[in-house]
Amino acid sequence: MASRKVVYRRPLAIDDVTSHSEAISAYSLESAFRFLDALESTLDLLSRFPEAGGVIPVRRKELEGIRAKLVVGFSHFIILYCVEENHIEILRVIRGGQDLHSVSLNAR
């Protein structure tokens, strides 16, 4: 069995998750907890199967090699990440429908 990769979250990704969970909790606290659980389950899946997400077709050089994976059970949220030799780096967690080429990947 392949070893798990460590999952690192960039500050922007942490901010994204906070923002999304707060927005969801305004309608349903239970749904917000389900979102957080689903996100963690998806990150666990990526730690075991890093290539589970598809490579994004790009127009911007800085996006080359970045993968996207839908949050299981919350398919309108997308995890943007890159696979490194010993870890996975979570760059952003965005809402579906956002133009991927306009999403900032720079640290806050």
Predicted regions and their residues:
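Arg/Lys-rich, positively charged N-terminal/basic patches that mediate binding to nucleic acids
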Residues: M1-A38, T42
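Enriched for short, Lys/Arg-rich terminal
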Residues: V71-R108
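Generic alpha-helical structural context detector
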Residues: S41-D44, R92
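Short, hydrophobic secondary-structure boundary micro-motifs
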Residues: F33, G54-V58, S102
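Residue-level signal for well-ordered alpha-helical positions
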Residues: H20, F49, V103-N106
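A short, surface-exposed loop/turn module that caps and links secondary-structure elements
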Residues: L45-V72
